[in-house]
Amino acid sequence: MARMTAEARRAELVQAAFRVMSREGVGAGTTRAICAEAGMVLATFHYCFRSRDELLRELMIMLSLKERVAATEAMKPGSDMRELLRQASYGYLEHLEEDPGHELVLFELNHYALRSPELRDLADEQYRRYYESATQILEGAAQLADVSWSVELPALARIVVAMIDGLTTTWLVDRDSDRSKEVIDMLSEYVSSKAVPN
């Protein structure tokens, strides 16, 4: 059997952390549990990561990237702004439906970080990434639809993040995708009203 590189071990430990936390919650993601899930000895963890916090940061980055990809890949050239926003949000909703554990882990990581002074910056970083993703999606949609934004993009991105956060939480509770699509349609209508033709 081929020897794993340090990078491959890191990636496997991050995936193992996700599996454990998705099944049992962030609190269950101890270094021991993660190593057991990955089929590695504890010393391997300390060889690959300086701390559990470093692994949590990498996990958060990986999960946030998957959300962005789900939204951006759903946007189709030739659509108007409202439709592009619907497509991106529906792409995210499909991602949520397919893997609710993904979002539960992100929410738990955020709450865990907010209660841990040494991890407070992790919560800040998570939302910086959300705002960056929303901004990039809005910029990409504006390019595809050949429009400009009539309001400051950081404020609009913040509105989108707040609405998607709320949509995610309510969907995790009630699993009502039809209602979530109604919210997406209203959000898309509102946000697209802030676009003006070039």
Regions found by a protein language model. Name each.
Residues 1-8, 19, 142, 197-198:
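N-terminal intrinsically disordered/low-complexity leader segments
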Residues 9-12, 16-58:
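Helix-turn-helix
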Residues 49, 94, 108-115:
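Short helix-capping/turn signature of helix-turn-helix
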Residues 58, 72-102, 153-160:
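Hydrophobic alpha-helical connector segments
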Residues 61-67:
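Short, basic, alpha-helical segments at the C-terminal edge of helix-turn-helix-like DNA-binding modules
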Residues 73, 98-105, 117-143, 185:
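Amphipathic alpha-helical packing segments from all-alpha helical-bundle domains
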Residues 121-126, 143-159:
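All-alpha amphipathic helical-bundle segments outside canonical DNA-binding/catalytic cores
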Residues 131-140, 163, 169-198:
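C-terminal peripheral helix-coil segments that are non-catalytic and often amphipathic
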